């Protein structure tokens, strides 16, 4: 190898090393390094909700949703991913938002649970993210047709939907919605104290970083 060629190679190698060193000293722009602010990135109850203690000491994350929701499906994906990554630290539970006059989502959700079709609840949440689709599928005949295509028999679903067991579960959903002051959806409560809404849950990296920040505060 000629001396000139060797010098050229060494020049490029040294230049690459300097560039690597310069990059390594750039400040990290990682979401995880941020300090998040109450009232901006998350909210807090003035009086935290008292939850029963868990024997496994995992922190509860309560996810309130509605099928008529543009952000709820992506929020569910974020929360499920976070709970899977941190299964030894947190436990995720889903609750449908319900009021005395708006019981549809809760009744459908608990009916699908009773039929061991939780996966269809998630599919329906995704399907109804668009307002036009929710308007369509909130009509029972259209919903039954959609469920039939997913393998749910019409009469079996209707029998479950109108059962006393489901009515009682929906009544409990109404109570929780009122007691927890759920005023929007998605609405996420962390350990009965911290609250996340669509303003945080619209972005996965941002939401995951805020979740980590709040869970670390609780431990």
Locate each region found by the language model.
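C-terminal cap of thioredoxin/glutaredoxin-like
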Residues: 152-219
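Extracytoplasmic thiol/disulfide redox context detector
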Residues: 17-101, 174, 219
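Bacterial N-terminal signal peptides
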Residues: 7-15
């Amino acid at each position: 190898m000629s001396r000139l060629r060797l010098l050229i190679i060494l020049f490029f190698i040294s230049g690459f090393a300097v560039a690597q060193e310069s990059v390594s000293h750039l400040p990290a722009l990682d979401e995880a390094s941020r300090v998040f602010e109450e009232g901006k990135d998350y909210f807090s109850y003035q009086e935290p909700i008292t939850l029963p203690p868990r024997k496994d000491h995992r922190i509860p994350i309560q996810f309130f949703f509605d099928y008529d929701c543009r952000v709820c499906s992506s929020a569910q994906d974020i929360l499920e991913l976070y709970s899977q990554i941190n299964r030894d630290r947190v436990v995720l539970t889903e609750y449908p938002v319900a009021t005395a006059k708006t019981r549809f989502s809760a009744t459908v959700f608990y009916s699908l649970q009773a039929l061991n079709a939780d996966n269809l609840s998630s599919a329906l949440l995704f399907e109804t993210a668009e307002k036009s689709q929710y308007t369509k599928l909130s009509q029972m005949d259209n919903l039954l047709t959609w469920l039939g295509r997913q393998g749910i028999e019409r009469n079996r679903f209707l029998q479950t939907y109108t059962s006393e067991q489901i009515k009682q579960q929906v009544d409990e959903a109404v109570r929780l919605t009122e007691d927890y002051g759920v005023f929007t959806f998605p609405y996420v409560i962390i350990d009965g104290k911290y609250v996340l809404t669509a303003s945080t849950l619209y972005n996965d990296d941002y939401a995951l970083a805020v979740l980590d920040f709040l869970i670390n505060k609780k431990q």
